[in-house]
């Protein structure tokens, strides 16, 4: 089973911190929440000192599915907002910006673990829209924020509208920290699982 295979990988690699994620599984009745929970529970029961972060899809905002993830007691709860609301409809038509915020808020209110989210820049957003999104995330209870550069996978995909400079990433980090985030990673190649243990402080 996958939980057991994850356990073997953790033991072989002597890992102390893992991030479990997946693609959307809207084809499953619980959107994959039960499998997330089984993986977390198996790992934490067999490797007691292991810290586990989950990076989940929105699970369609289904509270029963979200609650199932919470009951497994991961150490960090993550769901990526990805982009600002105006651009969200274009680049993630299958998703919903407000639903993602509701997921993050549910994790924050109903769970005990810190909540984390990630956003990509370079999709045509404005600085004002980024600041507004940061505020939305704070109001949803997000503590940790990751900001990275959007890189188009290739032809036929949404194009990169802007490449941010290191100075601009530093500025966004400083803005986010001043607004109240506890930890912020803001770098061109940063992704939500990048330096996850350091961000979590575990």
For the regions a protein language model found, what residue spans apply to each?
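Extended interfacial segments that mediate partner engagement and assembly in macromolecular machines
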Residues: 2-13, 17-26
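Auxiliary Fe-S-binding modules of radical SAM enzymes
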Residues: 4-5, 11-14, 38-50, 64, ...
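Hydrophobic residues within beta-strands of alpha/beta enzymes
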Residues: 18-20, 52, 77-79, 145, ...
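Conserved glycine-rich "GG(E/T)P / GGGxP" loop and the immediately following alpha-helix
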Residues: 18-38, 124-129
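Short, ordered loop/turn segments at secondary-structure junctions
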Residues: 23-25, 57, 81-84, 149-150, ...
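A short acidic, helix-capping loop that chelates divalent metal ions and anchors anionic groups
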Residues: 24-29, 85-91, 153-159, 195
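Active-site-adjacent beta->alpha loops and helix N-cap segments on the catalytic face
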Residues: 27-39, 62, 86-87, 91-102
